[in-house]
């Protein structure tokens, strides 16, 4: 059995730990922080807002928030991080000062009206480009009044931005979404003293009566990153894998459950349950069958590109529907998946809200074809999840990715661990 501690700290928790520390008034410690480009953007913005950040150990920081957030004399650069832009928008909406949030070309083309509308419901003064659809965003911090909001989309980023504004508003606010999204924000903030209640899917958020409690938080491994190696095991004959110290929040393991429904042998072993469930995941290769994914999309939206690779190895036609939000990620991920598969000669079809893929029962035929002619270069579209998903396919096919370096956005150790998996699995270790 291959045993991997993937050393890929959870991206969602790393962002939130930094941003939430700014609502405390005492130093906070974040251990095992994800040193990916996205999370480092959140850390740099915290510094630009006046926080003191000290490196106290490998991948560990002490963050001392300022008494009041500083109005920066420059644009707050989120680079490629949608989480940074959306959560900081909620935080800064009630802070004194003028704040401008911008990013790279990819981020500035992603939809931002989805957070501007709920923040404006509080009375927030926030503007975006092209009639509030896109960044850069300009925020003039101002007093907020409580509101009730029903979101048309299930998005943890939208929900988190709303909560951060609600904590600074006057009165009790409520938030409802049409499908459960990741709940790390609620869990973390409640543990730090925020009054957030969930009744039948409706969140009630009361304003903070005092600053959040200081914390010392160690971040577990990211299940979204771990999933790439669960996928590696699922498509590699005779392989068995143990993934250690993985965050097992129920809103984060839907992709593992989908892979399990496809036939992979997957078991969880919970090792601790303090703030969040953390444990190990056991995976064993087994023949895969086709799957239809149409529900709980918000809980596996990031893993759908990787699941598309599993679908290629499955018997039958697999389908993804109700996933239109894939078109609004770092790339149009529906188009990215389908165009790469079609370039490889794989039968697939693109829909407005998803795609279908006809699985190959015998991948060796495709491998033989590419032994006779050079396969097309896989296009990452500079999207880390597209690049890593198709990199897993190199376990079975002699492919090259045009820009695997973009994996550093969320998973700096990816290339090293993939090479390690190849070495151990093909050596029968």
Curated annotation (Swiss-Prot):
**Xref: InterPro entries:** Enolpyruvate_Tfrase_dom (IPR001986), Enolpyruvate_Tfrase_sf (IPR036968), EPSP_synthase (IPR006264), EPSP_synthase_CS (IPR023193), RNA3'P_cycl/enolpyr_Trfase_a/b (IPR013792)
One GO cellular component assignment for this chain's record is: cytoplasm
Q: Which reaction(s) are listed as its catalytic activity?
A: 3-phosphoshikimate + phosphoenolpyruvate = 5-O-(1-carboxyvinyl)-3-phosphoshikimate + phosphate
Group of enzyme by EC: transferase
Q: Write out the GO MF terms.
A: 3-phosphoshikimate 1-carboxyvinyltransferase activity
Entry's localization field? Cytoplasm
Give binding positions for 3-phosphoshikimate.
11-12, 16, 155, 157, 302, 329
> Which parts of the sequence bind phosphoenolpyruvate?
11, 82, 110, 157, 333, 385
Q: Which family does it belong to?
A: Belongs to the EPSP synthase family.
Described function: Catalyzes the transfer of the enolpyruvyl moiety of phosphoenolpyruvate (PEP) to the 5-hydroxyl of shikimate-3-phosphate (S3P) to produce enolpyruvyl shikimate-3-phosphate and inorganic phosphate.
The annotated subunit structure for this chain is:
Monomer.
UniProt-recorded name of the protein? 3-phosphoshikimate 1-carboxyvinyltransferase
The species this protein belongs to is: Helicobacter pylori (strain Shi470)
